[in-house]
Amino acid sequence: MPEVKVLAVRELTAYLQRLLANDGRLANVWVKGEISNLRSPTSGHLYFSLKDQAATLRCVMFQGRSRGLSLGLRDGLEVIARGQVAIYPRDGVYQLYVAEIFPAGTGLASLALQELTARLEREGLFAADRKRPLPLLPRRVGLVTSPTGAALRDMITISRRRFPGIELILAPARVQGEVAPRQLALALELLAKRGGVDVIIIGRGGGSAEDLSAFNTELVARAIYACPVPVIAAVGHETDLTLADRVADRRAPTPSAAAEMAVPVRAELEQRLKSLAERARRGMEHRLELARARLERLTKSSGLDRPRQELYYRQQYVDGLEQRLLASWERRSREREQGLNLLAARLEAASPLAILARGYAVCRRPGDGAPLKSSREVLPGEKVEVILKEGLLRCQVEEVGG
């Protein structure tokens, strides 16, 4: 009889858990059903079941997910829930761990958009602290829109009316259809790589929810988020916010309004600069007048006599110090000169040349030039050299005396 492997309950449960965890379809599944047995304990977690005519599915929605839930759940409500299927080991049952829940009448496209919006929000793409201010005076404005739409004409007209001569750079792109998300993202990337653009407007001139779908894609949202310069989204829809609106640094209701945000009125800016310059001039004149008045008061004050007298004392002290330093330097120079003269005299007295000058001579060997100090250092017949004050004698020894 073959050996039978017997599993513990926990081993079988763990095996089933691994099976469910490795099934990608069960990691993010949408389920439609009617709520029953809804419980909401003090922990904030929600426990309920989803059922239809043939089956029941246990569900749990933890407090972190249910806290911001706007939908009022109740027994009998038909909903669509998204979550992960896993086994609850204690009871040995599978259940749905719910991440999001929507009314059953919601379309799948709307559910997918809500899921994407929630995910991007968790990643921080909509955070207010990352929004960048628009430049006060942009040199170049980038435009990402259709080259044939009314939105482009409106933005060009308004920009040039507000600031004649401003440079507008168009990166054309389709704004609806299947290729629109890719073209919009690529246009943003090209403007960013080109450099020199201070602000970018991306948008279109309104339309239905389906027409605006390109601006609700993850590709466009991430392209705006990654753009190194401020972006204004102008999708042209007053009520519904697109993902592009949420990610952009500023949102404008229309392309025309976006142009007004991005481009200042030249005359107003010049007037503002003149006002600032005038304020700065008046402020400087006021400060100079205060300084002039203070100086005049100090000049007339008798209190200046004491500092002036102190200054004279200081100058007198410096003059005396200078004289003492010069005198000390001259004295030390004379002492050093006298010492050098004395040393030179001693050296002169000890010099062999001085001895020769007094009539003496130096006798040395002709080969090595060593001076001879005794007659015992030579023999008769050897040659020697005799050095006089003036000249040299080469001699031969005839006789050596003691």
Curated annotation (Swiss-Prot):
<keyword id="KW-0540">Nuclease</keyword>
<keyword id="KW-0378">Hydrolase</keyword>
<dbReference type="GO" id="GO:0009318">
    <property type="term" value="C:exodeoxyribonuclease VII complex"/>
</dbReference>
<dbReference type="Pfam" id="PF02601">
    <property type="entry name" value="Exonuc_VII_L"/>
</dbReference>
<dbReference type="InterPro" id="IPR025824">
    <property type="entry name" value="OB-fold_nuc-bd_dom"/>
</dbReference>
<keyword id="KW-0963">Cytoplasm</keyword>
<dbReference type="InterPro" id="IPR020579">
    <property type="entry name" value="Exonuc_VII_lsu_C"/>
</dbReference>
<dbReference type="GO" id="GO:0005737">
    <property type="term" value="C:cytoplasm"/>
</dbReference>
<comment type="function">
    <text>Bidirectionally degrades single-stranded DNA into large acid-insoluble oligonucleotides, which are then degraded further into small acid-soluble oligonucleotides.</text>
</comment>
<comment type="subunit">
    <text>Heterooligomer composed of large and small subunits.</text>
</comment>
<dbReference type="GO" id="GO:0006308">
    <property type="term" value="P:DNA catabolic process"/>
</dbReference>
<dbReference type="GO" id="GO:0003676">
    <property type="term" value="F:nucleic acid binding"/>
</dbReference>
<dbReference type="Pfam" id="PF13742">
    <property type="entry name" value="tRNA_anti_2"/>
</dbReference>
<protein>
    <recommendedName>
        <fullName>Exodeoxyribonuclease 7 large subunit</fullName>
        <ecNumber>3.1.11.6</ecNumber>
    </recommendedName>
</protein>
<dbReference type="InterPro" id="IPR003753">
    <property type="entry name" value="Exonuc_VII_L"/>
</dbReference>
<keyword id="KW-0269">Exonuclease</keyword>
<comment type="similarity">
    <text>Belongs to the XseA family.</text>
</comment>
<dbReference type="GO" id="GO:0008855">
    <property type="term" value="F:exodeoxyribonuclease VII activity"/>
</dbReference>
